[in-house]
Design a protein with these regions (language model features):
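Charged, solvent-exposed alpha-helical segments that act as regulatory interaction surfaces
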Residues: 56, 71, 128-129
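Generic structural signal for small/hydrophobic residues in well-ordered secondary structure
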Residues: 30, 43, 67-70, 97, ...
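Conserved alpha/beta-hydrolase catalytic His-Asp/Glu region
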Residues: 2-60
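Catalytic active-site module of serine/aspartate enzymes centered on a nucleophile-bearing elbow/loop
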Residues: 91-129
Length: 129
């Protein structure tokens, strides 16, 4: 997918439509870390699995799962539809979709407060499940 750090950083800019105030510092620190010897090669290994690999595992989920998606995620033509499809592939009742308005591919980093407002009630509801 990404053959170079430059390509990944350009993608990262697209993946963050709602940028936190510290985005430029975060981006610079991430770039510096990926420039360390061997880091980029290890990072690229994370892209060796495919969506099909993950999809095969969805029917085996046996605990409550929160599928958290940003409404502006550039990786999907329809983030809501993608989340719905993921949940539909899980055993009945296992999955819940939650959308973070205006967030891209990294809602936890772009909108941490909004993510917390979705995750904390989910965890409280399913504690001990």
């Amino acid at each position: 997918m990404f053959r170079s750090l430059g390509l990944f950083l350009r993608y990262l800019d697209l993946a963050y439509p709602a940028r936190p105030a510290d985005y430029s510092g975060y981006r610079a620190a991430l770039a510096a870390k990926l420039r360390e010897p061997g880091r980029m090669a290890e990072f690229l290994k994370t892209f060796k699995s495919t969506p099909a690999d993950a999809e095969k595992q969805l029917p085996h989920i046996r605990c409550p799962a929160l599928v958290l998606m940003g409404t502006a995620d550039p990786d999907f033509a329809g983030p809501q539809a993608e989340g719905d499809a993921i949940v539909a592939a899980m055993p009945g009742g296992a999955g819940t979709v939650a959308m973070v308005d205006g967030a891209g591919h990294y809602p936890h980093a772009q909108s941490p407060e909004a993510v917390a407002e979705l995750v904390i009630p989910f965890l409280k509801e399913h504690a001990g499940a």
